[in-house]
Amino acid sequence: MGVAALPPSRCHQMSDLPDDFDCTITTWEYIYGLCRDVSDQVRDDDFEPDVVVALARGGWFAGRCLCDFLGLDDLTSLKMEHYVGTAEKSGEPSVRYPMPEGSVEGKDVLIIDDIADTGGSIERAYEYVTDRDAGEVRTATLQLLGTSEYQPDYVGERLAEWTWIVYPWNFIEDMVDLVSSVMGQADQESFTQEEIRHYLAEFHGIDRIEMEIAQPDRVPEVLDEMERRDVLESAGPGEWRLADG
């Protein structure tokens, strides 16, 4: 679905992307498996970190899993300001919420994030941590896009083609953005649930089978939440339109 025409990373405003940029829906089980793969690589490499630094927000789940797999109880977080919403960003990566003083001093550190597309966030995190008198610092991502200029030490999965990954922990957030986008692009006033599904498949390659296998029965939940947030409004029984303003 037009992946080759995409810009080199997803770090663009939604308006800068083609209408048909590709998306992939993931499951908790699949991502848990990637966490295990990363932990296996760390052990095979004989690296024994003292602390895991999980980049907020995408690295939190992976950070907790890695602590479990590696037998660690020292987990801290670092917030890098980059993405605002689906396919949107706010400038270059910078530290928004720094780590507590002394949290990595003299310790071997493993930094984990969910994905690297340009690699800017995790590279900046590496620089930040090493500047705080840490011991050995290594980096890991669950997934790595071929567009990344930074190569982490450990990678759960390498993705040759660009795609926007919809993770289980931000499913609602991403789907609100995506549904709003396809409704704005389609040339009609109101939409049934089936029409919304059709446009998700047409513009983003999210077909019904993929959605229902990965996140079963969740489209109605997304639409209800969009109504609650005043993004959508009822256009009659079983139909919705984008809310004004």
Stretch-by-stretch model annotation:
Residues M1-G245:
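PRPP-associated nucleotide enzymes
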